[in-house]
Amino acid sequence: SFLSNVRFSKNGKYISYTKTKANLEKNDYEHYVYVYDTQSKENKEYTSLGKEKNIVWLDDTRLLFQTSRDSNIKEKKKEGEEWTEYYSIDVRGGEAKAFLQLPYSVTDIQACSSGFVFTANYSNADISLHGLTGEERAKAIEKKKEEADYEVLDEIPFWSNGLGFTNKQRNRLYRYETASQKIEALTPEFMNVEYFKVSENRVLFIAEEYHDKLEQTNALYEYDLLENRCSCLIEDGNYNFSFADYMGRDIVCAASDMKSFGINENHKLYFVKNGTLELFYENDTWLLSTVGSDCKFGGGKTFHTTDNALYFLSTLEDFSVINCLHRDGRLELLTARDGSVDFFDIYKDTLVYGAMKDYGLQELYLKENTEEIEITKHNRTVFEEYSVSKPEKIFMESYGESIEIYVIKPVGFEEGKEYPAILDIHGGPKTVYGNVFYHEMQVWANLGYFVFFTNPHGSDGRGNRFMDIRGKYGSIDYEDLMKATDIVLESYPIDRKRVGVTGGSYGGFMTNWIIGHTDRFACAVSQRSISNWISKFGTTDIGYYFNADQNQSTPWNKVEKLWSHSPLKYANQVKTPTLFIHSEEDYRCWLAEGLQMFTALKYHGVEARLCMFRGENHELSRSGKPKHRVRRLEEITNWFERYLKKQERE
């Protein structure tokens, strides 16, 4: 079970959350609303259709959730209309009731004093069917069908991973008045809202308005719902904001000017004072959890404010925690320095959070003062039914840094016996591996493999300077990975001729890079990879700014540098049999990246295979259709079995 979106009720008596489960037969995911009673300690499922999520508390006992139940709306959606349905339920008893129907594809919703504020997808190019009837509606539907054959692009990015083509689409801010049932747009047609937070009659939001090219800076706004007035607090052009909220009478925010370490620079915390930013805390951590796992689905709150404190997630070394930053500047760590805290909520002095602790799967934990209890047991039976090999931790030195290396032994490990091994490389590169459960790694450990992984330079958790490998891809990070491999092979009974390598996204880039620079690995699996920084620049949703920033070059000012950091340049040196895993709708690292490397290997006579997944994107391994996730893991595992256990079969 995957847990997400934990929320206290208004009076703190109840805690709601979403439980998501994969349904292999339906090849989809089911979402259920659960509520925990903090007084009776009872944990109860409140919905049963498997379509309920995105919970908002209306008051002390009633909650609102998104679902899909109305047959008329389903028919309208088939014709091309956008609708989002909300139902309410009283946790003291009774059936769920239809509460709100919005003629938009809602992306987030929050309650305000007079109704709701929400964001929704808005298209400046699409044909709207809302309000049309009779012949006029029929003609519009026919026109939409005709236009479905075409995509007109006149801005960048023109598509987005997980969303498809997004040309002229924006995430727009709206207000819904309960009394009048009136919906009003609060932002212009071409403004894209990235974040908003409601506090009674005021709304803070982060947005940027653009027409041809989306830049990486944005602006901070405040909307007064009583006076219907929008004020720009900090203008666009200087900062990238990621969060803002009210802290008593003050406004606190997280932002970076990106001048020292580029687009991945850690955001500092500021107060907004008279149109300027006043430093609150000199932060040098990423303000969320970047601890990876293939057993997370959905998210939740990562910031919370009171009159005198700011609570936030951050990634430290190889774990993530909840911090409390007091108004006087004192920083207090609220959770253990291990595992991954993924989301949380706070009511007065009580903290509830979702985490992967003690190498387990996600559960919810309740902490009041110093006392902490686990309030869910959704995933405990997994460890009673299956064998799990927990990682050991060893260390290496690299340019003055002590870097952890995790090693998972094969299940049923026997002294005196040599085993095959797999080096697994994380994506990002600004993420981390930690002492956190990975399903794929345990599958391999159960099949008799050592699995090892590390956090090379470029990873998160150690500050900006460690993270910053701009212009250095394939150098210092490659050195770290090869050194980690050397140390693991020296420390464990591994057959050096039966070691494989795999990774996804940046990890796929490194896999491609590795096979072009060494033949030490018996086989490789390159997933959702990068092979050519030049082609990625012009074909992906982030390429035009991410490539320029991370490589310190563009195809027009330093094309030789882009090419020198491209694994494709070295494909003529590859001898390693390589499997490529790529999704057809991966617009983060487009299919062309895998195809180019695959073609190059085939051209040069190297054994290669590519498995493409239709209808999937960059998130295949984490949230792809269940059957596709199974097939992906089968493809990878079969490749390792073929090349790393060949000697055993012989």
Predicted feature residues:
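Blade-terminus and WD-like Trp-Asp/Gly-His loop motifs, strongest in beta-propeller folds
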Residues: R7-Y14, N54-L63, D108-S114, Y195-R202, ...
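Cap/lid segment of the alpha/beta-hydrolase catalytic domain
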Residues: H378-S491, D495-K497, G504, G538-T539
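Non-catalytic accessory segments flanking enzyme active sites
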Residues: S4-N5, E146-E147, E151-D154, W159-S160, ...
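Surface-exposed loop and turn segments in beta-propeller and other repeat-based domains
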Residues: E278-G299, H378-E392
